[in-house]
Amino acid sequence: MKEKIKHFSLLTVSTLIMAVGTYFFKFTNNFTFGGITGLAVLVADKTSISASDFSFIVNMLLLILGFIVLGKKFAVKTAYCSILLSVALSTLERVCPMDHPLTDQTMPELCFAIALPALGSAILFNIGSSSGGTDIIAMILKRYSSFDIGKALLVTDILITVAGCFVFDIQTGLYSFLGLTIRSFMIDNFIEGFNLSKYFNVVCDEPEAICDFLVHELNRSATVVHAQGAFSGKDKYIVFTVLSRPQAVRLRNYIKENQPSAFMLISNTSEIIGKGFHSI
């Protein structure tokens, strides 16, 4: 039960982060990158409907379409996040109406317009969910066609961003292109940061003490391989293990103090599949 509460708390917080970044920094500056919300900015400028209301209507229609086409297997988490994002944007518009940017500094506003939604999206992706929108279209296309979904969504985002250059001005369009480019990299970097672990290769003479520290102090396991020094010809042992960053600091300090002659190779990794980490 605690895990479910924690999970839905993460869903809620990450979606609200996206809503804040989108409403306060993206909509007010007419940045057009980012799928449905980008399209909403264009529609809001040419019609009487607000960007928040347009996002709400389109997301609800896509949600209904998702349930009809994808059936009961349609992700409950995605539905929850899609509804929450739409409601949050509409609520912010009514509680805190804004007709101009928070500041007159476009670049800092762009940074927040990119970073907050990217952070929220990264958290959602990391726990197996999304905020709906064009992701629902991608799910439907993936099920019923052989289209390259990633390229199709990228082309759509580019077209919406190009349209922003004509609807608004070149400067706003260029900022939107910059946002589109940085956003995908930032999401990937956030996800890698969430999953970052330290991979250890420790070449030593006495692996037993290191393994004992791993098992009893860090609650981790390891693999030990017999090896031989190329220059000395002496018997050596290699201890392989993967740890979180705090655990890595403790192991590194332990080895420095107790086996200073050991050789440590420590590298970053975010793709670890297996017991104790991500399931296959």
What are these regions (language model features)?
Residues 1-206, 217:
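Core subunits and conserved enzymes of cellular information-processing
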